[in-house]
């Protein structure tokens, strides 16, 4: 493998591909909008699939639209897989998800140019509906792939704008024939921008992600009584917006009180009738709670529930909650995390251990194969925004760490145990 250790990706080419994909769904404010299974998503998929065909890989699509590009290995072994997603939020940036997919293609392109072979096949995955904006829950494609949701259930999920997941999948031509989970990887490594401020604030360039926060999403509907804003005394009001505002403050204070990695966000706030001189009769908000500790996440959920019950009693409000998504914290495979760290050291680059605060497809893949992630800095910690940015040298560096990590994994003999987090793995001394 001595010659393979000298391989490096072409950073200019990677940036070119990122810019080309960013033009699909581009908006005047500089953001990208490729909501899952829209025409823009289809065009993005078509572009990526055309690049896969150009690289000579086998392209396979499963029944929920997950795309896989597979480069042959010298032996009939499970593939080492990388990848991410290309769907975006409504005002997304150029890098979230797309960077991991395109860096994976650049790894294959680099190996092709060097006429390099690997024992294991190498795969690049493009997962469907990671963002969860148009279809709930998020990470839907990888969730189905990992066996967490049946295909039929996924197909029946309604879009926020009406049609079902299955209807839209067929409409854009990406309802594939392969059964989800048919390809079980030897390992999965996801390269991603941090989407947070830590690396940038510390002047770091790389993160080896060892775990990922658990996520609890709820929709809270608060109903009161609409009435005249000028004639209704404060003591006689049943104000839905007031109840929602109290909940916003409670979630904020709760997260600060629990401390540690606990965070809480009310990200959506809708008021009806939304008029200046009418007491709102209804408010619908979303609550996002996250923690790396499952017991503390459960505590936050219980305390929120108790608060809402008390609020309902005190203010005369009808309050209903609906679960949107719930994922437990994930601990990634520590052997792969160590390989990522060793690879960075081989490239003479500092790397720090990290936790992912955002949900990622890697957390679903960790259910079926050894998995870890690589982070590069997000300038200012900004993501899900047209201001989302990472320095080109960091994008190139992350892709080179991915290249060398994938090469080490693809040259291994032996079988990895899914879910092993203690570093125990039989690889015949090849790693």
Ranges and model annotations:
Residues 67, 86-88, 122-133, 195, ...:
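Acidic, glycine-rich active-site loops and adjacent beta-strand->loop/helix elements
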